From Swiss-Prot:
Its main location: membrane. PROSITE patterns: DHODEHASE_1 (PS00911), DHODEHASE_2 (PS00912). This is Dihydroorotate dehydrogenase (quinone). InterPro entries: Aldolase_TIM (IPR013785), DHO_dehydrogenase (IPR050074), Dihydroorotate_DH_1_2 (IPR012135), Dihydroorotate_DH_2 (IPR005719), Dihydroorotate_DH_cat (IPR005720), Dihydroorotate_DH_CS (IPR001295). The gene is pyrD. It comes from Bordetella bronchiseptica (strain ATCC BAA-588 / NCTC 13252 / RB50) (Alcaligenes bronchisepticus). Pathway: Pyrimidine metabolism; UMP biosynthesis via de novo pathway; orotate from (S)-dihydroorotate (quinone route): step 1/1. It is found in: Cell membrane. Catalyzes the conversion of dihydroorotate to orotate with quinone as electron acceptor. GO terms for biological process: 'de novo' pyrimidine nucleobase biosynthetic process; 'de novo' UMP biosynthetic process. The lineage of its organism: Bacteria, Pseudomonadati, Pseudomonadota, Betaproteobacteria, Burkholderiales. Its EC number is 1.3.5.2.
Amino acid sequence: MSILFHAYPLARPALFAMDAETAHEVTLAQLQRAYDCGLTRKLLHAQPEAPATLMGLSLRNPVGLAAGLDKNGAHIDALGNLGFGFVEVGTVTPRAQPGNPKPRMFRLPRANALINRLGFNNQGLDAFIANVQRSQWRSQGGILGLNIGKNADTPIERAAEDYLIGLAGVYPHADYVTVNISSPNTKNLRALQGGDELSALLGQLQERRLALADQHQRHVPLAVKIAPDLSDDQIDAIAEILPRHGIDGVIATNTTLARDAVQGLPHAEEAGGVSGAPVHELSLRVIERLRSRLGDAVAIIGVGGILSGRQASEKMAAGAQAVQLYTGLIYRGPALVGECVRALAQGSR
């Protein structure tokens, strides 16, 4: 365990000298190699006991991997064995697509932040499912979330068609499914968070889920991932709509378009969503507002700007039942997983 944890701080300067997306790919490849050699397989069982329940699912611990780090589901086992209680992969679209032109990911180290405009680059649903089927994570007791989106060239008026295809495709292989309607990098996607649009989409997804549950003889929870840049009225509308359509969870939040916290820094004016430290307070506001409106009707997963165990605890105190990590892993490395698990285990005593 110590070898891996000490290796990342040593490797970080070399990784940060690379283009951010290249470094991301190199890190995943090296992590996969470490897993294949057996170097990470003890980490999963080295975490303290912190069992939790989320959307009716039993978790080893309430610290998860956020979608986006493994878009094609090619590294589920390697990532899960870093000690996560659950892993979410994607976003996957029905058809493969290249995403936006490169460069499309930028570090802002002084702010512990990233800007990305990746644009749902992925290999498509068939390749995604094949990768998921090869994974041993679920057979080892891990919880797997599969995150679905729409293709960039699908008109927003027909977005539901893509989500219905995605839901049907991933349903047999998922412990839960996340509907991503909050990426700022797919044109007009965030419009689906609006009251009428959201209600129409979720109504169709719930109808399809009921049919799939009957077909596969199992209920798979549905979660919706929302943006941090919502007004109080928009949050309230979402909180009213989710339980009406039987939605089990809400993931708060995706990246922000706000630039206040990074103004004047190199790359700050690049188009795309900001993740990392600047999102922490924004997501806390959304989580607190959702919890005050939802009560216990819908589970909340807190994500955005967690770079310490203390910040994971703050997400839970705001009303989340679980948390997810992404950008914090880039700045802190895999040691962050255990730090968050320990903090939440202590907080639950």
